[in-house]
Swiss-Prot record:
GO cellular-component term (any): axonemal B tubule inner sheath
Source organism superkingdom: Eukaryota
Compartments, as annotated in UniProt: Cytoplasm, Cytoskeleton, Flagellum axoneme
Lineage: Eukaryota, Metazoa, Chordata, Craniata, Vertebrata
Ranges in a coiled coil: 198-229, 420-444
The protein, known as: Tektin-like protein 1
Pfam families: Tektin (PF03148)
Amino acid sequence: MPVLIPPVEHSQDTRVGHPAWREATRALAEEAHQLTDRCGQEAVTMWQPNESVRDPHVAHHLCRAAYILPWRFRVEMLKGGSTMEKPPPGEGVTLWKSKMKPPAWHARLPLPMHRDARALQTAEVVQAHARGARLTAARLGRAQHQINGQLRLLQRQREATDRRLSEVRKALLINQQSVKLRGYRPKSETISDKADSMLTWEKEELKSMKRKMEADMEKSEALLKTLASCRDALVFCCKERLQAVELMNQPLDKVLEQAGRHSWVNISRVPTPRTQGLKTPPPDPVGTYTPECAKALYEAKRLLMESKDTLLDMAKNEEDIREQQQQISDRVCASLAQKMRETLELKDRLNMTLGLMRGTIHRCTKFNQEMYITRGLIKGPLSKSHLETREKLDRPLVRMYQRHVGTQLPEAARLAQGTDKLQRHISHVEKNLDELLSMRKKLTWSFNCKKIGHNVDYSVVRLRLRQRHPQVCYEQAQRLVNDWDPRTPPRVKSNTAITK
């Protein structure tokens, strides 16, 4: 009698892992999610008002929807029955495309211009403290201030020009390293091309830029020394004039305003024919406006005009050279990239030719082997005892046929002729196979040369793009040119040298 087995109850949960294991992973993920939200919220709250911090017990999308609701445009009814959307009132940036106007955020941390603001406040305090001299001292101080500002501008421009000169020198080193790297190509790839001409042209242009910027540096250095000597003369004359008015509580700017002369406030301004306000007194050796002061002010005005023209020329040259250097570098990189594409195209063509030749060589080799087998089959066995009956020349059928004169069978002669013809064909196939192998060797060598040339050009482009980055200084590029050699292994110190 059959026995009925009760059906096995299958659980609804088909997962294999233990629930505690899943709960631990879920708890860890939830903890990481909460930590991410908390850290992100704390980082954002440093740049947002207090009311922007969301409630941790409310969903993120609900908090965001409630927070940005006042930002949205409001629909207003017009008299004609039409509607018009207007942004909400108050400060903020109006986003017309998204129809929102977020309010202005207030930073709780010092802004990046905090240092400049404090420096400006300090300068204002110092300038306010320095206002306490008479008219001549005020004019000398004003001239000294403008000369100092011009000195700072000239110094900054010299720094910018020096940085650009360093970039030009670094570009020369990069050019030298590029030529050096391209020298490691195989002999078949070292034929002079447009990329070499571009590198030579780049070198000449960079040398011309270098000479031009060195001339600007020499000119600005001489002007800087002249401005410094003029500033020292103004400082000496100003201190000498201030000796008699140290106790007079009257600002220098106020004195210049009361004088009513714009050319005294700004010494680079050309004076008008109709003078309004106070007039410049004649130089008096025993008066307030001495010939030394007049000479210092005249020299300061002349140098200020000259330095402005020099600054404009230097800034224009620096900008032009920067753009020209960038264009030249891009053109050289473009020519190298074009050479890489051409090399890659030729390399692919050689690779396809090698593949086709490889198949032909395999077929010729197989055919040659089959011809050897065919020749062996045609020649037959080495021993007579191994011949088949139908191949023997003394078999009864042949002897009966050869009883009459002139009835010789041409079987042996034709076998010899076929064997000789097959041997000549085998020799011809072997000759062709040798030519194919020789040509494959040449193609492989040319393919490897193209590959090396492509890798060298790629390394040159990569080196140029990496070395022309502003963070790479001139010394690093110089060490790269002087110390690194791709074909020279690193120096290994011997034990004797270490002991010494």
